[in-house]
Amino acid sequence: KAFPQFYVTPYLMLADKNKSSNINGLNQLFRINKNNKYRTGIDVQENSLADIDINQISVLSLVNISDLISKIENSEDKILNLDFEKCIQALSDTYNKDKYYGSSLKFEACKKCEFKTNENSDNLKSGFEFCFTKQLNWNANDFKKPNIFEIWDVKSFKKFKEDNALFLSEITEEHLGGVKLEPNKISRTERQWIQVQKSLNQDNISYLLKEELKSTMSSWCPPFNFIDFECSTSPLPFFKNQNPYQEVSFQFSHHIYHENGKIEHASEYINVTQGKFPNIEFVRELKKSLQKNKGSIFMYSNYENSVLNRRLEEIENSNEVDKNELINFIKSITHPSRNSSKNWQPSRAMIDLHNVVKCFYYNPHTKGSISIKKVLPAIFKTSSFIRKKYSQPINKIDVTSSNFPDEKIWLSLNGGQIIDPYTTLKPIVSEFSSEIEFIDENEEISDGGAAMVAYGKTQYTEMSELERNAIKKSLLKYCELDTLAMVMIFEYLKEVTK
């Protein structure tokens, strides 16, 4: 309406996964910045772009979205029950006046609400609590009651909403679609119902299918190998010939649990060298490490299997001299991805410890989660064996480390409460606070997402070696703890099946 004489054709400019960069460091030409209002913007490195033909390096493609825009303008697709212009006015007014709009609650979204707070939220308001107070009249006591959003892996909240059953005390097996049992394992719905019952009864005793777990473990072959990967994906490629969102495998950690009980941090790999594409070297180093013994290999979730399947495709399309050896290695320890047209039978398939926990073990302290970062602290609370062992320096309990001192103690207390080992990993700036300006003071390597961001930072040319090494050191510690956590979980399962 501002320019009625124009005919506008709308496009989105998107990163095209079918294109590849023909220069190194395309990502460095565009920087994300944040202003004091927590808004993000882009700084274009104009000096760097001056000598580059942007049309030649572009990994972007135009996508015509006329049909989608037409549906919005004609009010075929609506956010609110208003036509397009009135909707824009209403949303603008709501934002400018900081009003609560009061959209109807969608429980699937409420479960994942990004505006929940916890004890570390520094007096921030909880958007979750605000909505439920406004719309459902919940009071402070209601928020303390066990509710349906705590239940693991709920696929639909339709039945809960229809019956207005929001607290665990109000639900029945029917709300879970009925509890369906499966032989020799804890089924999904059985696990959910166990969680509900233990929460209501304030029962913190773990549930274990001991004989079934014992039978499964009897097929495992020592020495036991535990691996964890860290990877990065970016819409703007770091390297020449890399596609947008092409995964970069830059790190792994490898622990071995020997038959005599010795726990060895056997190897690790990390490549944060600016401008060096690490994917194939990553596989070579993993092959070198895992082929030193013939024992069972453990991952935690199917992530490592998926990563190696993607590396397999890259290697198959490469001209590497050891191409066949690397292909055979990957196929020996992985299953084909679900969407793969190829098929092979691994001789030494990786074992998913996440799936083992899911099928045979439930710990109420996890509140339904099977995340390694929830299972490990829960086991610390549950197992006197694990507590006693890891209350000692690692050099006293036959545990080696590549990144922690011999006197490192993994289990510590604060006011009688067990401290989550992951929270003991310090932010990278704590060691170099006065010397590092490139790293945000609020960032720390605390999960895979943070590791991915940290790797992206190492690919900027102006980062000093001091800064790059600080990130590298923190990444190594974090990844080593991940595989050690797997060992601890394995030790616990071994102990409870005696």
What is the predicted function of each stretch?
Residues K1-K498:
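DEDD superfamily 3′-5′ metal-dependent exonuclease/proofreading module
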